[in-house]
């Protein structure tokens, strides 16, 4: 009798919850704010910022001074094989390169976006979470945080593989790299700063399984956001005369099959790159992060190597939303009333039920879709999902 009473109580509870709160909610709406004017990628005036790219010519990487960009084609002046943007700027000087861009454009040639090499260089970056207020609100995290991201940069025209069981999500970001290693805040202040467009793909299923209640610890993020094709980078490295003004005004967008998903400017960052560097250098040497089951530091030996990127974080408009109170309550009742506690723990059961509902909603990236990150002066990235 007692067992039948418990069963009846559970069935009644599930029925009531199902009628009131446990029906699958509609897909979460996009919380991003969108500018009315369409974004047309171009390049900065040379006096504002110098734009560089690289391409293979006779199987050797050549540096280009970019003098124009339209319709996924860059026009650039070949500065020679093996040249580095930062070294070239130091050797020739900003004024000479501005003059070259303005008076020697007849030396330029066309280079399709697909021929340009990645602006990123290193296989380990410092990534940033919830550094745009609207994005922090949509994923219910209060403050920005960092984590190491592993995996080589891929070019501006590329692919990303959605593996079995993966809930693949996009993020568009601004990345920075520097002309020297950063070991102290003085290094950041003295460094020449270059910026490029970048993407940050995420396996939301893996992240949901690994993340802890202390989201700002970054645990789970390195595993869910690292991989051979999870870091696409734009075609240009842009070195502005005034980096703060340039970043603040830079607009970045994301679309999926032409549907707008993200739209923001760098001014929306909670922490600018100087503040991000300060936090990174203050805490980065401690092995407080996790990747593939091992404790790792944010930056090895407390130094961001030359070539490694510091990432801005993404604005609002991602697909994922964390489980809310309704989801947790419904999952808890289901776990108890189906005797799930005899098979697995409470948290895994609730998570797997939540992930199953997300997969059934079919809102995450699917093979055949195209993700496009675009920017006002950093170029664009076109990714085919496979």
Question: Which residues does each PLM region occupy?
Answer:
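Loop/turn positions that initiate beta-strands
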Residues: 306-308, 368
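Short helix/loop segment immediately N-terminal to the Walker
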Residues: 288-301, 326
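N-terminal non-catalytic cap/leader segment that marks the start of a structured domain
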Residues: 12-145, 150-151, 157-158, 165, ...
């Amino acid at each position: 009798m007692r067992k039948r009473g418990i069963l009846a109580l559970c069935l009644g509870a599930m029925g009531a919850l199902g009628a009131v709160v446990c029906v699958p909610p509609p897909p979460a709406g996009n919380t991003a704010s969108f500018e009315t004017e369409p974004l047309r990628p171009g390049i900065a005036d040379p006096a504002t910022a110098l734009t560089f790219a690289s391409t293979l010519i006779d199987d050797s990487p050549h540096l280009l001074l970019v003098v124009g960009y339209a319709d996924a084609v860059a026009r650039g002046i070949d500065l020679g094989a093996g040249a580095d943007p930062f070294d070239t700027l130091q050797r020739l000087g900003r004024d000479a390169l501005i003059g070259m861009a303005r008076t020697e454009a007849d030396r330029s040639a066309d280079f399709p976006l697909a021929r340009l090499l990645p602006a990123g260089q290193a296989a380990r970056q410092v990534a940033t979470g919830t550094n745009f207020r609207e994005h922090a609100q949509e994923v219910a995290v209060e403050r920005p945080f960092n984590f190491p991201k592993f995996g080589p940069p891929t070019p501006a025209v590329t692919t990303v593989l959605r593996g079995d069981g993966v809930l693949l999500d996009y993020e568009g970001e601004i990345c920075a790299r520097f002309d020297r290693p950063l070991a102290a805040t003085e290094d950041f202040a003295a460094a020449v700063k270059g910026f490029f467009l970048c993407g940050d793909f995420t396996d939301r299923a893996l992240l949901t399984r690994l993340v802890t209640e202390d989201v700002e610890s970054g645990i789970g993020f390195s595993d869910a956001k690292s991989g051979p094709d999870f870091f696409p980078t734009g075609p240009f490295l842009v070195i502005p005369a005034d980096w703060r003004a340039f970043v603040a005004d830079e607009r970045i967008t994301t679309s999926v099959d032409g549907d707008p998903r993200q739209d923001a400017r760098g001014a929306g960052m909670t922490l600018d790159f100087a503040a991000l560097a300060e936090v990174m250098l203050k805490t980065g040497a401690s092995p407080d992060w996790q990747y593939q089951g091992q404790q790792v530091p944010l930056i090895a030996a407390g130094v961001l190597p030359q070539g490694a990127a510091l990432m801005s974080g993404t604005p609002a408009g991602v697909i994922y939303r964390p489980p809310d109170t309704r989801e947790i309550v419904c999952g808890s009742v289901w776990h108890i009333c189906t005797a799930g506690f005899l098979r697995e723990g409470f948290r895994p059961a609730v998570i797997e039920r939540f992930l199953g509902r997300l997969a059934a909603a079919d809102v995450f990236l699917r093979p055949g879709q195209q993700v496009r990150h675009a920017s006002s002066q950093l170029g664009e990235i076109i990714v085919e999902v496979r």
